[in-house]
Amino acid sequence: MQTLFLRKGLSGHTMAAIFIHDLIPNVLSAVLPDTSGFSVIDANRKAACCQGCFRCWLASPGQCVMKDDLQTVGAQIGTCKKVIILSRCCYGGFSPGVKKVLDRAISLSLPFFTYRSGRVHHPLRYQNRPTLTVCFYGAVTDFERETAMRLVEANRVNMGFSSVQVYFAEKPELMAEVIKNR
């Protein structure tokens, strides 16, 4: 099975769901056999890391200036109904590829400051508030599980998700039912 990376324009049209994953193709087909209704983002695909230049805030608001498959990932997340992330748990965080995708979504926010949940954050660029489901796989210690839960909650607040659910499993294939029901 070939993974297709769908790019969404900035037309304001809302995607139903975005599925961000770090799986190899045969495992992806076992977890998500039917990708219709999803914009699938393969975190293993070659794409540049965020350079921290903030030109997505200033030079091309809402869009990364690096012209690759992650150029509009912030707009995709900001205008969809739900985001599902399936990632190997790495020391209580996302895998490097999934983290790269989330780093490139910095254009979800604006270059100003505001208070949310009693803390200083950047205001959000989009009014839409998608739901977030995160499925971590791999052998995870209690400390890594606790760290991952805190990280995902911080991402929920910072990226403007309306709600979050987090799941853990030894193998990604065990998440197929969770993803199917999201």
Residue spans for each PLM region:
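N-terminal beta1-alpha1-beta2 submodule of the flavodoxin-like/Rossmannoid cofactor-binding fold
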Residues: 1-83, 87-110, 157, 174-182
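Hydrophobic beta-strand segments of well-ordered beta-sheets in folded domains
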Residues: 13-18, 82-84, 126-135, 162-166
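Structural motif
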Residues: 19-24, 137-140, 168-170
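A structural preference for short, hydrophobic beta-strand core positions in alpha/beta folds
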Residues: 37-40, 163-168
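Short, glycine-/small-residue-rich phosphate/pyrophosphate-handling segment
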Residues: 112-162
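A short, well-structured beta->alpha microelement
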Residues: 115, 168-174
